[in-house]
Amino acid sequence: IDENYRTKKTRKNTFIGGSSCGGLMSLYASYAYSNIYSKAIVVSPYILESMDAILNDINHQNIQKNTSIYLSWGSNETSLMHEFVWQTKACTSVGNALSKKGVKVFYNVIPDGRHCEEDWEKECDTFLPFLVL
């Protein structure tokens, strides 16, 4: 990318983002490669199945200072309320572990937010300014 486009190559100007599994991968990249990425957009990550591994991984990482993560999920991603509660617990547990490592975590629970591109698109006005804060 840097060879073909005008870019700012510094960590401060290098971000990653994704939704669903892409959100999970962006979350991982944000702490495992914090020497490259300064900010991550993590939208509707499905972390329930891998939460213990993620928490263990975070605890063993040396995360760069000035790392920030926008972490969001919707209240209506599934039709089951208990899954929303589990997702909230998982996201806040991961966010708290990152905060303990010095990461700035910005949470955003989307009322009636579903697990779909149509709803994620509506978040652009919220998470894009986060990148330039």
Where are these regions (language model features)?
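Non-catalytic cap/lid and distal C-terminal segments of serine-dependent acyl enzymes
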Residues: 1-133
